[in-house]
Amino acid sequence: MNQRIERVRAAMQAQGLTQMIVSDPKSVWYLTGVEVEPYERLLALYLPVCGEPVLFLNRLFNVPNPPCKAVWHDDVQDPVAQIAGVVDAAATLGIDKEWPARFLIPLMQHCPGMRVVLASDCVDDCRACKDEAEQTLMREASRINDEVNAAVKQYVRVGMTEKQVARFVDEQYLAHGCEGNSFTTIVSFGANAADPHHEPDNTVLQPGQCVLVDMGCRKNRYCSDMTRTWFAGTPTEKQAAVHELVHRANLAAEALVKPGVRLCDVDAAARQVIAQAGYGAYFNHRLGHFIGQTDHEKGDVSSANTAVAKPGMIFSIEPGVYLPGEFGVRIEDLVLVTETGCEVLNREDKNWACVGE
């Protein structure tokens, strides 16, 4: 944890900051090991560049041995006044994007004239590059996702509803000891798969339809995410061709990932494959997103992101083609940027398969 705090402090110094309030519960855990869901109550870590960090905790939080100095409050005390007594009102204060206005505005009233700036990047950029312990947890979450995906492929049958299949996915995660899903499972049959974020409904799987399953679990606080697309029976020539196209786009992007490569160029590698086949207009989202303690963390793989890949980054590669009124295909893996290239965390087969027969 000390190494993580020092990395954040270095980022703060690079931005000219001497102090910061970290309030995102996942970032607080990342830096201190304290895991709390505060709900409407105040949870904050005061992090100075020099000096001991200070945790501000409600007495209802189950934190028996705080790893640093702790200032406690109950429900009738004013925790913002406690923070005001610790911060340097003459210096700029960085805050993260999760801190509610109901705490920030009173602090500014306690400390009139204090400059406040958004400093989420100081923590988020550190969280983007996973250390070895985090990489191990991400591999395990992806291994479970592969196993559950393989089970789903065997489970799906013509006549089932999208909700039935989604419920099976969720039950499998619990059976594998996961805390739950990293996001709401997406199951899309036929034309529903042309909506990238379709919510499972009572649509019944019919012969000849595509089956798109986008799924992820949360295990030991870390998330997985993958998508596979199959067909209920032998696909048509068009369905098979689109699936093969998306598969090639996925592989083209993954082959490019290594330290120093711009993330916009990774996006372009997949997009070019699809565009050259005449389907560019039907790939209507970015190629990928960063992932870790949450399914979508800061950072993406898109045409707008000129940042370069760095060792330890983990993000999705998920090209898709979505044909309104017909079907959709998406193939998604998570990749870990290594020192020399990338490691694809998902091993489950990406080729099209016949299911439900």
Regions found by a protein language model. Give the residues of each.
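Active-site neighborhoods and metal-handling regions in enzymes and metal-associated proteins
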Residues: 1-357
